[in-house]
């Protein structure tokens, strides 16, 4: 029973290992993790319409220097201010 509980806990925490562990290895910053890359490409700021990055009802204007998450090439941050992730 104890072994089963340990395995269940490990399986639940395994996908979130990058959130739990330190983001630096031997003083060097780690590269973008698959978890964060997946979040960027799949779920956040998934379309650029009229210079605005649209996601979950939020938008970031191109002309706004503060909190801007978009440019003409698309999203430049992995989150937009005002989304459900804030």
UniProtKB/Swiss-Prot annotation:
Transmembrane feature ranges: none
Propeptide: 20-42
4-hydroxyproline modifications at: 65, 81
Record flagged with keyword DNA-binding: no
GO cellular component terms attached to this protein's record: extracellular region
InterPro entries according to UniProt: Conotoxin
Annotated compartments: Secreted
Tissue and organ expression note: Expressed by the venom duct.
Domain writeup: The cysteine framework is XII (C-C-C-C-CC-C-C).
Designated name of the protein: Mu-conotoxin-like Cal 12.1.3a
Organism per entry: Californiconus californicus (California cone)
């Amino acid at each position: 029973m104890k072994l089963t509980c340990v395995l269940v806990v490990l399986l639940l925490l395994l996908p979130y290992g990058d959130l739990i562990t330190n983001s630096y290895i031997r003083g060097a910053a780690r590269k973008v993790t698959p978890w964060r890359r997946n979040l960027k490409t799949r779920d956040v700021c998934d379309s650029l319409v009229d210079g605005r990055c649209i996601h979950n009802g939020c938008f970031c204007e191109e002309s706004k220097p503060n909190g801007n998450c978009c440019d003409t090439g698309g999203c430049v941050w992995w989150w937009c201010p005002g989304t459900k992730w804030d």
